[in-house]
Amino acid sequence: MRIVIQRVDRVSLAADGEPYDQMGPGILAMVGIQSGDGNEKTFNYMLDKLVNLRIFEDENGKMNRSILDMGYGLFLVSNFTLYGDCRHGRRPSYSSGAPVQEAAQIYEDFLAYARAHAGADVNSGLFQADMQIDTHLSGPVTLLLDSDKNF
């Protein structure tokens, strides 16, 4: 599983042209899924990172607070392009990502796991929808997570 994390002041998402979900301050997490990601070990590792990363400023201006410390939310959005391979040619290959049906199930399972265990409000996008996302980035702070710890 790969996740791009962005610290946001607010985010709103439309799916297939219709308003779908919104959130105030917190983390917007773009989630890419590969085969084999649908297990509790992966879910626990990634969710623990998401809710405990200290990327929000404390009273001294130091990034020392998590969404749990701040009472902020988590917004999960599926994004298959995180497994795009641009090393050869000019069109990315997405063969490293999980097949659509498997990815859909893993995303829904991860979303349910996050809602049950995050300790924070969890918002979401709609899997395989055409989504328009309006964000107000804070910082900007953008980080990468990989369950295989490649980076």
Give the ranges of each region predicted by the language model.
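N-terminal, polar/charged subdomain of small-to-medium soluble alpha/beta proteins
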Residues: 1-93, 101, 105-151
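An anionic oxygen-ligand recognition environment, strongly enriched in 2H phosphoesterase
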Residues: 96
